[in-house]
Amino acid sequence: MRVFHVKHFDVVVIGGGHAGCEAAAAAARMGVQVALFTLRKSGLGVMSCNPAIGGLGKGHLVREIDALDGIMGRAADEAGIQFRLLNRKKGPAVQGPRAQADRRLYREAVQRLLAAQPGLTVIEGEVVDLQVNGGRVQGVSLADGTSVWAGRVILTSGTFLNGIIHIGDQRRPGGRMGDDPSQRLAAVLGELSLARGRLKTGTPPRLDGRTIRWTELEMQPGDEDPVVFSFLNRAPKARQIACGITHTNARTHQIVRDNLSRSAMYGGHIEGVGPRYCPSIEDKIVRFADKEAHQVFLEPEGLDDDTVYPNGISTSLPAEVQEAYVRTIAGLEDVRILQPGYAIEYDYFDPRELRPTLEVKALGGLYFAGQINGTTGYEEAAAQGLAAGLNAALSIREREPLHFSRSGSYLGVMIDDLTSRGVTEPYRMFTSRAEFRLSLRADNADQRLTPIGLDLGCVSDARRESFNRKRELLEKGRALLEGSSFTPSQLNELGIQVSQDGMRRTAFAVMAFGEEAASAVARGVEGYGDLPEEIRQQLAKDGLYAQFILRQEEEAAALKRDEAIRIPADFDYAPLSGLSSELKSKLMRARPSTIAQAAQLEGMTPSALTLILARLRRAGRDAAAV
């Protein structure tokens, strides 16, 4: 980070959250001069809400960011104090790495990575206006009257645009607790005539870990064989800890129920829509009234920090009500609240106003990334920041833009969802959103995206060398597997039961029979067992899904062909048990007349379309039989 001494840059990034840090680093890796504006340098990389990175779908995004040499995965590996691979018992395609992080270590890691990045200048100051000329952005103006010129501007405002913090019936302006909102810039953006709306998110009260009865709680350790995020790392760097698990109860629920009218959300003080898949404790008790208890994870916020994050009870109830209901929870009877939970409401813009590069259609040179586009979550924000930063730098260099495809990355799925379908509620990533998820595994993100990074020039020499070594080993292993074949009798001798059909099967094809088959192949193919475990694991996953991926591609093509099929106006979605309640309500409200229209609904998934098609075809057959 250098002292601010120039007033012209190639790219200006506004905001130092997860999207802004990733955008600034990505653009600078492309060799352009970047200025990152933030209200406080000490706030760069702050984890404003939960102290965790990754998860289902989200962990895939972190791996993709890392594959393009982004910073989130490396910072999470440095700061991670508990690593868990979610969905470990399910197929590799939907397994998601997650790490609970030490807030201080994560923030310091991000700041250190930014400081080491050539071409990146971090500047403290509030951007209050955009310099525009001839329908293109030309730079920004600061609150102190300074003008800074730049050919491209990336806005990553998070929850700061007209942000309002709510605790019960109390409300005050704020971008997050302790920070002022961005109101002047919000007014300037309002003059662009872009479609905009209000969203909200929330956070739970922070607890004093010294007042928790830890000995009375169930403890959850991390994985014994932790899976880290960066392809450059092999193991966590920080000391690992366990988290506590407790539950709400009938007393908790009654206190919340009795005070619903005092909640900012249920008291009518908030107009913004909250995240469906991260509901407040008020939402849980209203929407899931039949549930007797809700799980709460007690996550220490750091190795040297007594603050505990109670994951699962975010709220906008008054502070005294929060204290009352929290103390009904087992293990928290004497707990002290260090900071009350709160809801925050903020402006966002319809992402359909953006090109797939995340450039604003109505104003050339201006890019949006993160929560300003209607997403929720650190990982979704960081991934958008990466895409915006790379594309802004490519544009400055007058090179072809980078378009991430749905078939090649979760990043491509997210950007396509946002720019083609828009959002009416905070968007978060799930593996179910990707029609090609069998080939978009977390473990092969480098094989999918690092070659793109090499072509762009955004990947370090160290990563290039590491990637090339891994690719050579994968090619060697694949050749060994494809070059070896077995008769049914030989496979039976190895402990793999197949029909005696006389067909020889390559060792790669045998991988489709699962883990035991992969172990047997390691014994039966000369030289294969000498390959590193990581390489053999990835090849086993490639083989496991090979046939399914072909079927996946055929199903995606079939869906494309079936887009013209009509859906009756009175079609009943309620009996489709495979549809989420979210999609049922959206389908019944929108009443799409064709499969193509249904496909454009926000939150629609390929599996949901397949269910609708199957029901339509069954109805057609039944009608023909009458």
Curated annotation (Swiss-Prot):
Offer an example of a GO molecular function term for this protein: flavin adenine dinucleotide binding
Q: Name the InterPro entries on file.
A: FAD/NAD-bd_sf, GIDA_C_N, MnmG, MnmG-rel, MnmG-rel_CS, MnmG_C, MnmG_C_subdom, MnmG_C_subdom_sf
Which of this chain's residues are annotated to bind FAD?
15-20, 127, 182, 371
**Quick one: where is this thing mainly located?**
cytoplasm
What species was this sequence derived from?
Cereibacter sphaeroides (strain ATCC 17023 / DSM 158 / JCM 6121 / CCUG 31486 / LMG 2827 / NBRC 12203 / NCIMB 8253 / ATH 2.4.1.) (Rhodobacter sphaeroides)
Q: Which GO terms describe its cellular component?
A: cytosol
Cofactor entry:
FAD
State the function annotated in the UniProt record. NAD-binding protein involved in the addition of a carboxymethylaminomethyl (cmnm) group at the wobble position (U34) of certain tRNAs, forming tRNA-cmnm(5)s(2)U34.
Quaternary structure note: Homodimer. Heterotetramer of two MnmE and two MnmG subunits.
Into which family does the record put it?
Belongs to the MnmG family.
What Pfam families does the entry give? GIDA, GIDA_C_1st, SAM_GIDA_C
- The reply to whether DNA repair figures as a keyword in the UniProt entry is no
- Biological process annotations from GO: tRNA methylation; tRNA wobble uridine modification
- Protein name, please? tRNA uridine 5-carboxymethylaminomethyl modification enzyme MnmG
Can the keyword Transferase be found in this entry's annotation?
A: no
Which Gene3D superfamilies does the record associate with it? FAD/NAD(P)-binding domain, GidA associated domain, C-terminal subdomain
Q: Where does NAD(+) bind?
A: 274-288
Supply the gene name.
mnmG
Where does it reside? Answer: Cytoplasm
Identify the keywords attached in UniProt to this record, alphabetized: Cytoplasm, FAD, Flavoprotein, NAD, tRNA processing
